[in-house]
From Swiss-Prot:
Oligomer status and interactors: Interacts with putative receptor-type tyrosine-protein phosphatase mosPTP-1; the interaction probably mediates the recruitment of Japanese encephalitis virus particles in complex with C-type lectin mosGCTL-7 to the cell surface. (Microbial infection) Interacts with envelope protein E (glycosylated) of Japanese encephalitis virus in a calcium-dependent manner.
Keywords linked to the UniProt accession: Disulfide bond, Glycoprotein, Host-virus interaction, Lectin, Secreted, Signal
Any one Pfam family match given in the protein's UniProt record, by short name: Lectin_C
SMART domains recorded: CLECT (SM00034)
Record's GO cellular component terms: extracellular region
Organism annotation: Aedes aegypti (Yellowfever mosquito)
Function: Carbohydrate-binding protein. (Microbial infection) Facilitates Japanese encephalitis virus infection in mosquitoes probably via capturing viral particles and presenting them to a ligand on the cell surface, thereby facilitating viral entry.
Location of the C-type lectin domain: 18-140
Protein name: C-type lectin mosGCTL-7
Cellular localisation: Secreted
Amino acid sequence: MQLVHVLVVLLSVVAHAKKFFIPNLKANWHKAHEFCISLDMNMVSVESPKDHDELVQFVRKTDKFSNATRFWLGASDLAEEGVYTWVSSSRLMTFTNWAENEPSSTEAENCVEMIHNTYVNRIWTWNDIDCRGFKAYIVCEERQSIAQFR
C-alpha cells in the first residue's frame, strides 16, 4: 500500500514540473504556435503565480533576457473578442499578470506577450498585441499528459 502512495505523490510532483524551450528566433504569434507544434510542444501556458515565477526564472537564465525583451505566451482572444484562453487547452485564463491598462482589447490586439522592459516600467507584465504584425521570442513547453489531471 505504501508503494502506491509514493507513486501517486511522485506523479503529482512530476505533473507540476514544467520544461521550457526558447529557440534563438523571433516570430509572429501564429508562426510561434506552428513552431512549438512542429516540435511536439505547446506554446507556454501560465496558469498560476507559480507557473509565472518558473517561467521568469527560466528566462532570466537565458541569453534572451535583457532590459527590453518580449516573449509570446500561448493565449489569445481570437475565438471570442475579450475572452482570453490558452491555445493548448482552450481553458479560460484565470490567472493573469496584465500591465496597467491592459488588455486594451482593441480588435487588432488578440495575442498575449510577456514583457520585461525597464525603460517603460513593464517588469514581467502581460500585454495584448497584434498577432501578425509583431515578432517576439517563442516560448514552448513540453506537453504533459499528466497535467490534465491537476
